[in-house]
């Protein structure tokens, strides 16, 4: 529209152009519709030029200020679509749970000084997103706390976490682990008798504190630590994890036999819910001073970019090498078979992990003359692997870190917390399947496991939501002091599980809380026909790849070669004599898969 100007006072004002009739008739603007494509163009114009330190794979620059929550997105060249609806509006169900007031931002050393300085009785709630050093603060506090008894009680929710904390303490003080029952009992007796000669840490699972060792007169300690408090106390409030009578007995032991006889109560979690803090303070009881500490991040966020894809993992594509990220499964096969990269995948179910492994092996192109070494690590595969080792059937690895180090594709159950960070050095891509369901662990625990994958070579997380369920937390019971927590968690679960859209929004908000610089994208969607759930194709491909139930495990000594049957679990061996068997090498070349 042509403009003319008119002087009004000392200013020139733009006026509409005159019509042909010269009457100055007002011109009605055309109805303009801003399309999604126009918004994308507008965003691209505002993107700053790409600096020299950009990782070509991630499309993300170095973070100058690790506390800056503004996305540092520089674009990418894989064709994915920038998600215009970045972090959705935060609903009250999440605000009320995780965004309370009066939290004090604090560094790790300062937090240790508050926890350990001798003063009156106190309750300390300590939270911090992934990478803030919560475990380090805990271990430092255990080493520096002073008191009259020399005893510290550390309560956890998983036995894996008990073993990891014992490892992290690393000989700085004596550790009594409840898994060693006789030694643990002797340590409790020494503490009650005042016979301890050094600082001692007693590590116990919350399910075991009702033992007779704690039912006597109150057990005196200098400090009680409840690590991953929401996971730990979920054992009490969840109907599926503990019976009502056992939950009441556990609550009574905490409130009557343990908390009144300590000077310091420290509860720790990544996103410590406000009602959980209130409930723990009520359980602590008596007179005390309360501290709410929020640890400042000490390292850059692990992920800068999150690509959302469909989770139809059981699709076998005839041509998986084309770069199409419409599903997580296609992104996985592209990274493995086209790029030859090592990847790590988290899934919420043991069964899902096994099915995903089968489909990854079945998607191998015919011209691809290697087989990826796919390792599944869940509670069931761990126990089965240990049983084979004890029976002297195989010489395979057992520990999660050793298995992750040798795998080409590492699939683990996100609901089985390893209790510690995993070194993923050499892994080029991370994939996460999420699920909102009362049969699996909480969404917070699923998210937390994504942050335990340290030192991976990519800053991109490929993720997708498998399914949602109405009222997924309906199995949470009301326990006196934790009643408000249970009520608000059920409300949060109902909102997350009420629709697939709410589930996606909820995970975006929680990812943004965990990784402040993260930028969301949507995987490229291209229409095509799928051989969807075609079992004939899957079974035929698996037979061609020798990924059948019966595998030959090769030991270094030929006299010990034998067949081992394990459902859906391919077994591998080293030092295979060449040209004596029909076999394929793994991608890394460390192992060979023998054809049945």
Curated annotation (Swiss-Prot):
Basic residues bias (residue ranges): 1-10, 18-29
Provide the leader sequence positions. none
> Which Pfam families did the record assign?
ResIII (PF04851)
Q: Which InterPro entries match?
A: Helicase/UvrB_N (IPR006935), P-loop_NTPase (IPR027417)
Q: Which domain of life is it from?
A: Viruses
> Where in this protein does the record put region Disordered?
1-30
What Gene Ontology terms describe what this protein does at the molecular function level?
A: ATP binding; DNA binding; hydrolase activity
Q: What is this protein called?
A: Uncharacterized protein ORF67
Organism of provenance: Ostreid herpesvirus 1 (isolate France)
